[in-house]
Amino acid sequence: TGIRDLPPALPMILLAWLYILAVFGFVKQAAHRWFPQASAAAYLLTAAGAASGTQIYYLLHRPSVYEYAILCGATFVLWALWQWLCAANTPVNRRKALTFHLVFGSLCMALVAGCRPQMVLFAALALPILWPRYITEKRLCTRRGAGEAAAFILPVVLVAVGLMWYNAARFGSPFDFGANYNLTSNDMTRRGFAVGRIAPAAVNFLAGIPGVQTVFPYLTATRMQTNYMGLTITELYYGGAFACLPLLWGLAALPLARRRLGSRRDLRTVIRLVLVCTVALAVVDCQMAGMLYRYQSDWLGPLLLAAALAWLFAESVLQARPIPALTKALRTALPLAVLAGVCYNFCVYFAAEPQLMGQNPALYENVSRLVQ
């Protein structure tokens, strides 16, 4: 934090709560926009699943400056998406509230560049969120719409000018964020781009299988295996997103209702953009730095929100065309998917390094006795 009496752990706890608040706020606004008939149970379960499946608990387990920057970036991304969705849902006659949401959302997304620059890729989601009002309805061509567009852009410009001035003063270029100057295990300036790194990293990020054992905490770390002849930076890994978080499996059902999804182009575009950004960030991370478990935080939050939208969409489809067997399956699968994500992150928290067995053996042993 740069403040002697404010270690990273304290603001990280606050950021974690803000992250969870943004998840629930986003899902609520998404339900208001696309799923007005969504049940309270579906809203609470999807929001709880997106909040509990995230890596914020793992980051809190390692409260260093590096994890602090990652959590800042992830929190700002979700707040930006939430505020933009609030702006899209705010009636145009409430100009002050509408302008506030636009400005605050853009400010949050602009601040991401100062924390975790690659996460700014999710700013592309502003297009499908705001497109219907400002392009389809041609509000951008009006005087008030132009003013709102200026309010949307102004925070980005101001933060960009400040960051570019800082980068130029410290690193000699307005576009150099200093990532290559990390004192780490390898020369960041000579990593380059190697196609051979992509497939192993992407598979592990998205579908890696964690190690399992029969005693608490039931998960063990694994290491990425690769035939790539160059250097690949890796750390202990605890499983890929799609392999360990069943909430994400809801995305697989979207092609089954592609016609209904096609009638909601903005929703379809939001989900597709999240998937594209997820793959892009997985590739960027493995090329820029390596295959590290905490790098899932760069894209896992928006991906879980997309999965929440998929589950809400499934419920809306079954409300419009009830099929008792599928409705029952949905009502059973969604709580189980959320519970599985909670259990997975619970196990990771006690299995991950630095292990609580050494840091807080009393807590570890008490929980172990309660669970086993």
Q: How would you label these PLM feature ranges?
A:
Residues 1-14, 32-37, 59-63, 226-237:
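Juxtamembrane segments of multi-pass membrane glycosylation machinery
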Residues 7-36, 79-83:
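Transmembrane-helix motifs of polytopic, lipid-linked glycan transferases
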Residues 23-55, 75, 91-100, 267, ...:
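Transmembrane-helix signature of polytopic, membrane-embedded enzymes
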Residues 78, 100-116, 123-124, 155-163:
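Membrane-interface alpha helices of multi-pass inner-membrane proteins
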Residues 86-110, 143-147, 151:
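Short hydrophobic alpha-helices at membrane interfaces in multi-pass membrane enzymes
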